[in-house]
Amino acid sequence: MSARSQALVPLSAEQQAAWRAVAETEKRRHQGNTLAEYPYAGAFFRCLNGSRRISLSDLRFFMPSLTAEELRGNRSQWLYAVDVLIETQGEVCLLPLPGDAAERLFPSVRFRVRERSRHKSALVMQKYSRQQAREAEQKARAYQALVAQAEIELAFHSPETVGSWHARWSDRVAEHDLETLFWQWGERFPSLAGMERWQWQDMPFWQVIAERSLAAREAGHAVREMERWMVPNKLREAA
C-alpha cells in the first residue's frame, strides 16, 4: 500500500502532481521509453502547472526568494535536487532545496523515516540482546570451567594445606561455590569428621578454613600422615 493511499486528508495540488510525476515516469521507464534529463522534475512541473520547460518561476515553488542571479550557474543542481526528491518520494532532499521540501510534497515521509529508524533500532537491539546472551553464556561456561579446575586442585590438598587452595581461588570463584566444594571434599578426612556445615554458617568462610587447617595440624601424627597419603598425588608418588 502506497503512502498516498494511507493519507487521511485530501492531497494538495502539488502533492497530487508529485505522485502523478512518480507514476508517469515509472510507467515510461518500465515501458522502455527514453527518458529526458531530470524526468521526475520535468513531470512534476508539467503535472503541477503545465510547464514544458522548467523556469525560474517554477523553481520558486520551493524557494520564493530565489533570484535569477542565484539560479545562474546552479540550474543543474536545482533540477537534480528536485528530480531526486520526486524519484525517492521525499526520502532524499538535497541542497539547494530547503529542508521542508520533502514534507511539502510527501507529508508521510516523516512517518516513513521514523518507522524505518524504529525498525533499525529494534534490529540493533535484537542483535545486541543476542550478543549479550552469547557473551553471558561464554562467561558462564568459562566460570564453570574455573569451578571445575578449583575442584580438581582441591582434591590434591589435605586439611593442612587447604588454606593455600582457598587463597589461590578466593578472588576467582564465588565464595558460595568454594564453600560447596570444601564441604563435599572434607567429608573423607578424619580430622574434619563431625563438622556440620550449618554449625559454621555464621562464621566467615576464610575463618572456617583457617580454623580447620589449624585443627588438622594439631591432630595426632597418625591422622596427619593418613590424610597426607589420602591425597592423590601422594598415592602416585608411593607407586
From Swiss-Prot:
Domain of life: Bacteria
Key word NADP present: no
UniProt keyword annotations, A-Z: Plasmid
Family membership noted in the UniProt record: To PsiA protein of plasmid F.
Function comment: Not yet known.
Protein name as it appears in the record: Protein PsiA
Species name: Escherichia coli
Gene of this entry: psiA
